[in-house]
A protein has these predicted regions:
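N-terminal pre-domain/capping segments
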Residues: 1-81, 245
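Well-ordered, non-membrane alpha-helical segments in soluble/globular domains
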Residues: 43-47, 72-74, 104-112, 199, ...
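Alpha-helix-loop-beta-strand connector modules within alpha/beta enzyme cores
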Residues: 47-61, 110-118, 146-150, 203-208
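Active-site beta-loop-alpha junctions enriched in small/polar residues
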Residues: 7-11, 32-36, 61-65, 93-95, ...
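Hydrophobic "anchor" residues on beta-strands that sit immediately upstream
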Residues: 26, 30, 57, 124, ...
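Alpha-helix N-cap/loop-to-helix initiation residues
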Residues: 14, 37-40, 66-69, 96, ...
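Histidine-acidic metal/acid-base catalytic patches
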Residues: 1-3, 14-22, 77-86, 137-140, ...
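Active-site acidic/histidine proton-transfer and metal-coordination neighborhood
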Residues: 22, 67-157, 232
Length: 245
């Protein structure tokens, strides 16, 4: 059975997010990181001590612009070691320049830089595919190029960032994802993360035909009210437990 995770929502106190995750049988929580550092409720500083105090599994999701890797990968390594993490998710963005072949080459070099720092510490790096809102590491060709040049890089597949079912199949064929981001969306909206069942994604088809017997990690990227998260978890568990047709 896959491990199911939820978000540690930074607008809530960490102790409340911990209680919610534990009460609803989540296996871990995802922590947000960007160029400000770890993002948790301001009343929970020092964040490292707060996270370690509750002794609940977590994983960091780092949103990094392509010009921020050299500054933040060493900072992330320090945090990962303090939290005893062996996995890191990077969500690449590009806010400061046009996205073209040269930009993709910069991303490739930054990934190699990150791998060279993280791998000696036994830390696996996962790169997340993007939506068309910030179209870098989005298309099949871009994703194929990055993975073909970085054998040690792992794939986090964000299902809410796909264009359609064919796009999803192509991405799975390039690199089997060991982690999934799960949320629903309407395909005519450029970027959405809705509760499961509130959009157009056919998760039953995905887990019966495209990712049958999936056994990796699944993170519900849903920040709505608690009931939406719980209902989404129940639906995904039902899809995972439905016999393949």
């Amino acid at each position: 059975m896959p491990q199911l995770g939820c978000l540690a929502r930074f607008f809530n106190r960490y102790k409340d997010e911990f209680k919610f995750a534990k009460k609803n049988n989540f296996d871990f929580m995802q922590l947000w990181y960007d160029n400000r550092g770890l993002c948790l409720h301001e009343d929970d500083k020092d964040f490292i001590n707060t996270i370690n105090k509750y002794n609940f599994p977590t994983i960091i999701h780092a949103v990094l612009n392509i010009n921020e890797f050299e500054e933040h990968i060493p900072k992330l390594l320090d945090i990962l070691n303090k939290l005893n993490h062996k996995e890191l998710i990077i969500h690449p963005i590009c806010e400061n320049e046009d996205i073209d072949e040269e930009t993709l080459n910069k991303l490739n070099l930054n990934i190699k830089y990150a791998l060279n720092i993280l791998k000696p510490h036994g830390i696996n790096l996962f790169l997340e595919n993007n939506s068309k809102l910030d179209p870098i590491f989005t298309t099949t060709d871009e994703i194929q190029k990055i993975f073909s040049q970085n054998a040690d890089l792992e794939f986090l597949l964000d299902i809410a960032h796909i264009d359609n079912t064919n796009h999803l199949q192509e991405l799975i064929d390039i690199k089997y994802p060991k982690i999934l981001h799960i949320a629903d969306r309407h395909f005519d909206v450029i970027h959405e993360h809705l509760p499961i069942g509130h959009g157009e994604i056919d998760f039953q088809y995905i887990f019966s035909k495209l990712l049958p017997k999936y056994n990796g990690k699944i993170i519900l990227e849903i920040v709505n009210k608690d009931s939406d998260i719980i209902n989404s978890k129940n639906l995904i568990e039902n899809f995972l437990n439905t016999p393949n047709q």
